[in-house]
UniProtKB/Swiss-Prot annotation:
Residues 411-459 form the G-patch domain. InterPro entries: G_patch_dom, GPATCH3. The gene is Gpatch3. GO terms for biological process: negative regulation of RIG-I signaling pathway; negative regulation of type I interferon production; positive regulation of DNA-templated transcription. This is G patch domain-containing protein 3. GO terms for molecular function: nucleic acid binding. Residues 274-299 have a biased composition (Acidic residues). Interacts with mitochondrial MAVS; the interaction is markedly increased upon viral infection.
Length: 525
């Protein structure tokens, strides 16, 4: 049989969460109370938010005192009205001046969980899902029934005045009335309410195919990524004779925003006036920190890797072989081979110390990231590499693949928009009959065979002409799918080069698939 203390710890405790802004929905409240809801061995017994409006006590403001006397005292009609109607008029006036808030009755298991809920959330500021502060604070109070306060049951005898009164017999709010509230009777699919039901319950319903998809959308459920629970790695080591220092518990939302702690005596209106100053100070700090950050397209390590071979010393490409005709002394039993591996020779080839350690900070590297970036020297260097690759047949620079109007990147496409409104499409000529030239003409300014004077840019290349491959006189090899080079062995591109680990010397062997006609050909009889 359980002791009375254990029963008191397991008995449900009812609390009232008040001051909830009307703009908050159940999905935002799930994010706000996620840390308490998802804890192991605890959480809410029931938290079903139904947007129940609350009516705060009337507060006399100095503006109302200076406004004049009570209108009910001056107007005889309001003076003759019942007291309940007068209170309703005052309540409507005060509600219009204040922000409308809601409340909700919740239940937790035991007094320890109730104290933990009060310690974590009572008096903290409200936050939405984006981490924005909302007016008001979270107020949590324990709900005590009249029978719990007096520790007495209902008195069986009544006086004559009580018998003649028209008041209801069940006017006192009892525990049975409390359990009939819609906040404590959630749907079957949400046993702990739309706010208090943990994610593991919804996961079980999804596994059993019993959860409607609309609930996931309404509550904005975000399930964690599947993976190890790390239940064995998160166990702390218990040292002997160790004293634990109690620290203030930080409360976070589901998005990782920390819920600020503050006393209820602080004026939220005064805090709202300080926000623009804080935003300006934060913007100045961001500008100062942004000046120190390195936002260049070519980082320092990328430059070092591009200018030096084997920067990590893992590929061992520094040990190169160099053969030279030298006088070789006969060695009995020797191989007769000499590999010249003098490191001093290669250090002299690399230059002095300044040349070896230079990172070329004066060179504009933006041309390797942006086609129109860089200075003239960098663009000319890329153009020279492009022409050399075109001569060697390594680059396919056909003019037919270019797009019309690449200059419109600088004009924001204004000319294209105007022509498209008139019915023009890409690839068509101008005019009502589309008889114009669809492609722009290159104005060289001189005869193409004239290789002197103003306007001469160098050798005129024919990028659309493919070079003929020389016929091989070797043996005919049967190719396989494994002869095709891997993606990391495709060779260098115009703006990027392959790492030293890629295969540079290999025989190109194109794989030719067998045709079905050759297989289906009938054999001669």
């Amino acid at each position: 049989m359980a002791s009375p203390r254990e029963l008191d710890e397991e008995s449900p405790v009812y609390l009232v969460v008040s001051g909830i802004p009307a703009v908050l929905r159940s999905a935002q409240l799930r994010s706000y109370f996620s840390q308490f809801r998802e804890q192991r061995g605890g959480g809410f017994l029931c938290f079903h938010y139904r947007h129940r409006p609350e009516r705060g006590p009337p507060q006399a403001s100095p503006e109302a005192a200076r406004a004049g006397p009570d209108p009910a005292a001056e107007d005889p009609v309001l003076a003759q009205a019942p007291a309940s109607d007068a209170r309703a008029v005052r309540a409507r006036g005060s509600a219009a001046a204040q922000t409308r808030t809601c409340c909700c009755v919740v239940s937790v298991r035991g007094a320890a969980q109730a104290q933990r809920l009060l310690r974590m959330y009572s008096g903290r500021r409200w936050l939405d899902s984006q981490g924005t502060w909302l007016p008001g604070r979270c107020l949590i109070r324990r709900l005590r029934l009249p029978t719990e306060v007096s520790d007495l049951g209902s008195f069986p005898f009544k006086t004559r005045k009580e018998l003649q009164s028209r008041r209801a017999e069940n006017e006192a709010f009892t525990l049975a009335d409390l359990k009939q509230l819609p906040e404590l009777n959630p749907p079957v699919l949400m046993p702990n309410g739309n706010v208090g039901t943990p994610l593991r319950v919804f996961l079980e319903l999804i596994r059993s195919c019993r959860l409607p998809p609309r609930i996931i959308t309404q509550l904005q459920l975000q399930f964690p990524k599947t993976g190890s629970s790390r239940r064995y790695g998160n166990v702390p080591f218990l040292y002997e004779d160790s004293e634990t220092v109690e620290q203030e518990e930080h409360v976070y939302t589901a998005e990782g925003e920390e819920i600020p702690q503050g006393s209820c005596s602080e004026d939220p209106a005064a805090g709202s006036f300080d926000e623009p100053e804080d935003e300006g100070q934060q913007q100045e700090e961001e500008e100062e920190s942004g000046s120190e950050e390195d936002d260049d397209r070519g980082e320092e390590w990328e430059r070092h890797e591009a200018l030096h071979e084997d920067v990590t010393g893992q590929e061992r490409t520094t040990e190169r072989l160099f053969e030279e005709e030298i006088e070789l002394k006969w060695e009995k039993g020797g191989s007769g081979l000499v590999f010249y591996t003098d490191a001093q020779f290669w250090q002299e080839e690399e230059g002095d110390f300044d040349e070896q350690t230079a990172d070329d900070w004066d060179v504009d590297m933006s041309v390797y990231y942006d086609r129109d970036g860089g200075d003239k020297d960098a663009r000319d260097s890329v153009q020279m590499r492009l022409e050399r690759r075109l001569r060697e047949g390594q680059e396919d620079g056909s003019v037919l693949g270019g797009q019309v109007g690449t200059f419109e990147r600088h004009t924001k496409g204004i000319g294209r928009k105007v022509m498209e409104r008139q019915g023009w499409a890409e690839g068509q000529g101008l005019g009502s009959r589309c008889s114009g030239v669809p492609e722009a003409l290159d104005g060289d300014g001189q005869h193409p065979r004239c290789k002197r004077g103003l306007g001469y840019h160098g050798e005129k290349l024919q990028p659309f002409r493919q070079l003929k491959r020389p016929r091989r006189t070797g043996l005919g090899l049967i190719s396989t799918i494994y002869d095709e080079p891997l993606p990391q062995d495709q060779g260098e591109t115009l703006l990027r080069r392959q790492p030293p680990t890629s295969m540079k010397f290999r025989t190109d062997m194109t794989f030719v698939k067998g045709s079905s006609c050759a297989l289906d050909r009938p054999e001669p009889e």
